[in-house]
């Protein structure tokens, strides 16, 4: 019984990751004809690393119901620790 529950949890966790948004590069963004642009998202938070900022963009993309995102800006403008990130999102 315990192994069945464990197996079910593993399947659910793996399937949840397959629904995550996919980051695409410049070339892919220009050549995707079968997607609909949903606009641009902006995030200004105190992140320790660029990967944390990318994770936040991914989560916001998911929250907006988009499938793909293309990072258009990621920078730390001053010494205040806030990282500014923005991305085009697509469905």
From Swiss-Prot:
Disulfide bonds: none annotated. Keywords: Periplasm, Signal. One of its GO terms (biological process) is response to stress. GO terms for cellular component: periplasmic space. Residues 1-20 form the signal peptide. It is found in: Periplasm. The keyword ATP-binding does not apply. Coiled coil: none annotated. Belongs to the BhsA/McbA family. This is Uncharacterized protein YjfY. It comes from Escherichia coli (strain K12).
């Amino acid at each position: 019984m315990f192994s069945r529950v464990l197996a079910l949890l593993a399947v659910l966790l793996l399937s949840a990751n397959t629904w995550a948004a996919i980051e695409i590069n410049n070339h892919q963004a220009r050549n995707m004809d079968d997607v609909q642009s949903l606009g641009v998202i902006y995030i200004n938070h105190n992140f320790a690393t660029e990967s944390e900022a990318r994770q936040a963009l991914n989560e916001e993309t998911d929250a907006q119901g988009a499938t793909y995102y293309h990072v258009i800006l990621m920078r730390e403008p001053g010494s205040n620790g806030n990282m500014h990130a923005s991305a085009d999102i697509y469905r």
